[in-house]
Swiss-Prot record:
Keyword Transcription regulation assigned: no
GO molecular function, one term: 3-dehydroquinate dehydratase activity
Protein name (database record): 3-dehydroquinate dehydratase
Binding site for 3-dehydroquinate: 50-52, 86, 216, 235, 239
Biological process per Gene Ontology, one example term: 3,4-dihydroxybenzoate biosynthetic process
Keyword terms of this UniProt record: Amino-acid biosynthesis, Aromatic amino acid biosynthesis, Lyase, Schiff base
Cysteine pairings via disulfide bonds: none
EC number, as in UniProt: 4.2.1.10
PANTHER family: 3-DEHYDROQUINATE DEHYDRATASE
Family label: Belongs to the type-I 3-dehydroquinase family.
Keyword match Nucleotide-binding: no
Source organism of the structure: Geobacillus sp. (strain WCH70)
Record lineage: Bacteria, Bacillati, Bacillota, Bacilli, Bacillales
Function according to Swiss-Prot or TrEMBL: Involved in the third step of the chorismate pathway, which leads to the biosynthesis of aromatic amino acids. Catalyzes the cis-dehydration of 3-dehydroquinate (DHQ) and introduces the first double bond of the aromatic ring to yield 3-dehydroshikimate.
Length: 259
């Protein structure tokens, strides 16, 4: 399949091209913390910033969420913004919202066009179609994701999750798992490579924790389009400081492509 079919372009950033994108999370609890963190992160020039709104203490107030999104946009400029409410079940911070209220908030954020992408978990199966319709209408790219913080499921199951995301209309499929052994890392890499050959959309995969660090450094070689790095504060175990990640990617690519 032509690689151009697998590229998603957001504000000029190519997701799914030859180079992996670096995404850095924003995890502040207050608007003040979020904006301070955004300024610090943007100075380090990530390709994408992810606002983990499940850490925002005022997430129950849609107006405050939109005000904060606007303030983030003003700082981020043309850096693409990914809006995420990670569920507690999939490793997120507990939030005082029902599943319906979360979908309503995603909808309002899409309508505001203050962000470029949203990440919605595959577990919202019934709501995904209507949210996909809204995101398309307002030009917001949609990542559909699966996170397992306890284990690494078999390769076939991981590939199926990514195929499921594409069948639901995702622009990008994401899988994150927890390894218990180096063998689990191979499972993740094999699933990534296999899904890459079957999907017509970009995919993002990683193993978490210290053992999974290698997947954040080398996942792009198997087909993962984005890797997550720490700008100021981590949103998941095993994330690497953005400076270190950029340096390692530079060294590996320099010797891979230039001998």
């Amino acid at each position: 399949m032509n690689i151009s079919q697998k590229i998603v372009s957001v504000r000029g950033t190519q997701i799914g091209g030859e180079q992996p994108c670096i995404c850095t999370p924003i995890v502040g609890a207050s608007m003040e913390q979020i904006l301070s963190e955004t300024e610090e992160v943007c100075r380090k020039r990530p390709d994408i910033i992810e606002w983990r709104a499940d850490f925002f203490k005022d997430i129950y107030d849609p107006q405050k969420v939109l005000e904060t999104a606007l303030a983030i946009r003003k700082i981020a400029g043309e850096i693409p913004i990914l809006f995420t409410i990670r569920s507690e079940k999939e490793g997120g911070n507990p939030v005082p919202l029902t599943e319906t209220e979360k979908i309503e908030l995603f909808t309002e954020v899409c309508k505001s066009r203050l962000v470029d992408m949203i990440d919605c978990e595959l577990l919202y199966e019934e709501e995904l179609a209507s949210l996909r319709q809204v995101s398309k209408e307002y030009g917001i790219r949609m990542i559909m994701s699966y996170h397992n913080f306890s284990s690494t499921p078999p390769k076939e199951e991981l590939v199926q999750k990514m195929l499921q995301a594409e069948s639901y209309g995702a622009d990008i499929a994401k899988v994150a798992v927890m390894p218990a052994s180096p063998q689990d890392l191979l499972v993740l890499f094999q699933a990534t490579q296999e899904a890459r050959s079957q999907l017509s959309i970009p995919l993002i995969t990683m193993s978490m924790g210290g053992l999974g660090v290698i997947t954040r450094l080398a996942g792009w070689m198997f087909g993962s389009a984005v890797t997550f790095a720490v700008g100021q504060n981590s949103s998941a175990p095993g994330q690497i400081p953005i400076e270190d990640l950029k340096e390692v990617l530079h060294i590996v690519q320099k010797h891979m492509f230039h001998g």
